[in-house]
């Protein structure tokens, strides 16, 4: 068994299974033996079986037949010989190795029945021969003869490739096709020969038209030329311009390289407008200014954007002193009235004897001829015929009104300005209009006061009434303090605006008479502790206020910054503090402390803010 396993492994290792196919054929031409295997009275039936194996140094008749096996049909034979038989075919599906071992056996069939295994009885074996041969693939038959001890066998064999297989080992597969997988035929050696219009290893690549660009074109069938994205033209050699490009070229897709004389993103701006359009008429000179613009320099006598208009030189009234103008080609002439001459009738032919100066002007003769008028201060002109307007140059600033007085000009200033030309803004804060330490900001004929805390009005002369908005809730009484409103709450309420009820909360917390439940006892204990805590807090607050009052009294007994001011105020200045008789302001660290002697009515007390100040 071990020998058989090793034999099988060796057989498999020698066989190179590939996609190949072929046929081994063997023909028995004659067989004779000295042994008698037939009865004398009749002919016998025999058949031949072959076993094709890989090449072995010592040929074993034992299976397996690694390359394949085959046998003839049952043949009729005479007493000791047999004539030729049909070929035995052994197909194989591997790469033909070129060497092989061959075992040929002759068997007695006992009867002419075909489908019966006569090899189970070794007594039916007539002869067996084994040989090792080298055989190349081809259609030619190899003749061979084998001489045994008592037999002679003549036979021939060959190996040829199956259809669609080629090569020395029948390992080259080539099947002609004309579909999506290829378009080719096969030559005698199994090489693919592409059909017309196809190329490539599998003849699956169509051959495009001869002028089709290899880089920018492609085809799906022979003779076509389809362009890739960004290219166009019959041969796909023209790049596609940027969309909207008018006068540009490209070397790569989506470019817009402007041609000479054109510019802009889309090459739609004519940079050489003069050459391309010649817009200037009448011999004018055209100059490109870029971005499709130009200017025309006109010849004398012409005007307009394109010099298309002929200018009448008389339109500008060049003739002076009442002369009449005559238009000429690119020129003019003046017909001067009596007493004037020159190109524009600008030269006066009159003399001082003609009394040419008006409005009191003085005439003086000139050595070169003619005269000159010396005008009085309020007139001007060659003959002092024009009245001089001294307000024409607008001498008054800041909206001042100019009044021409003849020899001079007068400026009437707007309210808030002064000066000969109204150039000075009057300082409206110079007279200190802001009261009660307010800060003044000058404006134009106006001022603005920034009032200190507790005062209001245009000049900060009015006390601010912080109680106008009625901030105190639940019947609280409002008092005006310089720091804002102060609320005196009625019993049962507390807070800066008397917004928190006090008695209602305590009534809800107090237990009803006659209830002795454990929860009531617990609430009573809590209320007792809370009452003790509140009493301690109230005592501390009262003690702190007394100390603060004493400290303020000590501070107000002194005069800070070496300044003491005593103000005796009447009732109308302090309507809210009627009985003040003396106020001492003391300045310390930017704060104001007030000490006052005051007689309070019965049942009334001072109110103090959280900072300790009088409210």
Swiss-Prot record:
Cytoplasmic side: 544-615
GO cellular component, one term: plasma membrane
InterPro entries with a match to the protein in the record: DSL (IPR001774), EGF-like_Ca-bd_dom (IPR001881), EGF-like_CS (IPR013032), EGF-like_dom (IPR000742), EGF-type_Asp/Asn_hydroxyl_site (IPR000152), EGF_Ca-bd_CS (IPR018097), Growth_fac_rcpt_cys_sf (IPR009030), Notch_ligand_N (IPR011651)
Biological processes, Gene Ontology terms: cell differentiation; diencephalon development; midbrain development; negative regulation of Notch signaling pathway; Notch signaling pathway
Disulphide connectivity of cysteines: 161-170, 174-186, 194-203, 208-219, 212-225, 227-236, 245-250, 258-267, 274-286, 280-296, 298-307, 314-325, 319-334, 336-345, 352-363, 357-373, 375-384, 391-402, 396-411, 413-422, 429-440, 434-449, 451-460, 467-478, 472-487, 489-498
Stretches assigned to the Extracellular side: 21-522
Residues annotated as domain DSL: 159-203
Record's keyword annotation contains Transmembrane: yes
Residues listed as glycosylation sites in the UniProt record: 459
Domain spans labelled EGF-like: 204-237, 241-268, 270-308, 310-346, 348-385, 387-423, 425-461, 463-499
Membrane topology: Single-pass type I membrane protein
Subcellular location: Membrane
Pfam families: DSL (PF01414), EGF (PF00008), EGF_DL_JAG (PF21700), hEGF (PF12661), MNNL (PF07657)
Signal peptide, first to last residue: 1-20
Keywords assigned by UniProt, alphabetized: Calcium, Developmental protein, Differentiation, Disulfide bond, EGF-like domain, Glycoprotein, Membrane, Neurogenesis, Notch signaling pathway, Repeat, Signal, Transmembrane, Transmembrane helix, Ubl conjugation
Transmembrane regions listed in the UniProt entry: 523-543
Molecular function terms from GO: calcium ion binding; Notch binding
SMART domains the UniProt entry points to: DSL, EGF, EGF_CA
UniProt modification remark: Ubiquitinated by mib, leading to its endocytosis and subsequent degradation.
PANTHER family the UniProt entry points to: CYTOCHROME C OXIDASE POLYPEPTIDE VIC-2, NEUROGENIC LOCUS NOTCH HOMOLOG PROTEIN 1-RELATED
Function: Acts as a ligand for Notch receptors and is involved in primary neurogenesis. Can activate Notch receptors, thereby playing a key role in lateral inhibition, a process that prevents the immediate neighbors of each nascent neural cell from simultaneously embarking on neural differentiation.
Protein's name in the database: Delta-like protein B
Source organism of this protein record: Danio rerio (Zebrafish)
